[in-house]
Every structure is written in structure tokens, then in C-alpha cells.
From Swiss-Prot:
Name this polypeptide is given: Delta-stichotoxin-Hcr1b
Other notes: A synonymy between H.magnifica and R.crispa is controversial.
Alphabetical list of InterPro entries matching this protein: Anenome_toxin (IPR000693), Myo_ane_neurotoxin_sf (IPR023355)
Taxonomic source organism: Radianthus crispa
Keywords in alphabetical order: Disulfide bond, Ion channel impairing toxin, Nematocyst, Neurotoxin, Secreted, Toxin, Voltage-gated sodium channel impairing toxin
GO biological process, one term: regulation of signal transduction
């Protein structure tokens, strides 16, 4: 399933996710998540 940035932290409008805002690739052992409030944005967060 798709993870969402907002599940684990502030939404994209206030930034500072669990991970970092990232439009390309995420670091190894991190996963790309989508932001609910801004469809064009995504973030990376550590895999659980």
C-alpha cells in the first residue's frame, strides 16, 4: 500500500516530515510517501 507523509507527522503545508521532502529517490531503507494535502509533493521516511 501507499504510505502517506501525514500519517507520521505534520502535513506538507507545515513541512518537516518524519523524513525529508524528496522529489527523486529516497535513501536506502527509506520509503517514498505521498502528501495528502499537496499531490505534487512527496517525502521520504524510514521504513517501519
Amino acid at each position: 500500500g501507499t504510505c502517506k507523509c501525514d500519517d507520521d507527522g505534520p502535513d506538507v503545508r507545515t513541512a518537516t516530515f518524519t523524513g525529508s521532502t524528496e522529489f527523486a529517490n529516497c535513501n536506502e531503507s527509506w520509503e517514498k510517501c505521498l502528501a495528502v494535502y499537496t499531490p505534487v509533493a512527496s517525502c521520504c521516511r524510514k521504513k517501519k
